């Protein structure tokens, strides 16, 4: 594995990320959610892609792709491992979203290219990174109240908003992926909340990928 080459690719790709609002349709008619996991001891990469109507946030379509994992887990290079399955799921969608939430980092990455940014560049769609853990940078401790907010900073640059979306839950790290500003990323996530820790697009993507009860109930209703 030539990490120097991958690192150079990351730096080059990161320079092409658009950190300004460039939505083709604003407000969007459809918002997507994406989640990636691994099966069979990491040998299979599974990507779930969901499509929600906006502003109702009703689930209207989902696709799950499973492919052979193409590279091992290497911290800082996860997007190279995840994007092939994401691309496979994306290509199956009959309707593409106007805005995509990705479970993972956007520019809140040591080389400013998390999976939300990498995938957003690949398919040229506005993306937002919604991550559950910090990858780099520092932030002031949050109060325990829901709605508590702090800027994630690294080398004098704001990379994300750290936002406690729900009481007694760890905060989310919300960042530009591609073609969405940092402040708009936070605003869009806040518009897509329904009382859970995660915004609806990534909550549904996780539910589909993991076969959670909410998704099982949804399937039964569709029959």
UniProtKB/Swiss-Prot annotation:
Enzyme superclass (EC): hydrolase
The UniProt record lists the keyword rRNA processing: no
A GO biological process held by the record: DNA repair
Entry-linked InterPro entries: Endonuclease-V
Main location: cytoplasm
UniProt superkingdom: Bacteria
Binding site for Mg(2+): 35, 103
Family assignment from sequence similarity: Belongs to the endonuclease V family.
Protein name, per record: Endonuclease V
Species of the source: Salmonella arizonae (strain ATCC BAA-731 / CDC346-86 / RSK2980)
Taxonomic path: Bacteria, Pseudomonadati, Pseudomonadota, Gammaproteobacteria, Enterobacterales
């Amino acid at each position: 594995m030539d990490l120097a080459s991958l690192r150079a690719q990351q730096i080059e790709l990161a320079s092409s990320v658009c950190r300004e609002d460039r939505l083709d349709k604003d407000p969007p008619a459809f918002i997507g959610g994406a989640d990636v996991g691994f099966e069979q001891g990491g040998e299979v990469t599974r990507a779930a892609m969901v499509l929600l109507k906006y502003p109702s946030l009703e689930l209207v379509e989902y696709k799950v792709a499973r492919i052979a994992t193409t590279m091992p887990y290497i911290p800082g290079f996860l997007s190279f491992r995840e994007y092939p399955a994401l691309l496979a799921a994306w290509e199956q969608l009959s309707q593409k979203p106007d805005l995509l939430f990705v479970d993972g980092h956007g520019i809140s990455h040591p080389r400013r290219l998390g999976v939300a940014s990498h995938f957003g560049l690949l398919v040229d769609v506005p993306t937002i990174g919604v991550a559950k853990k910090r990858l780099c940078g520092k932030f002031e401790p949050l109060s325990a109240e829901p709605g508590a907010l702090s800027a994630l900073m690294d080398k004098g640059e704001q990379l994300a908003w750290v936002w406690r979306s729900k009481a007694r839950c760890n905060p989310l790290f919300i960042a530009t992926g591609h073609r969405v500003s940092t402040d708009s990323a936070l605003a869009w996530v806040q518009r897509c909340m329904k009382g859970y820790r995660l915004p609806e697009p990534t909550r549904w993507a996780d539910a589909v990928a993991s076969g959670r009860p909410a998704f099982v109930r949804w399937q039964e209703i569709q029959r």
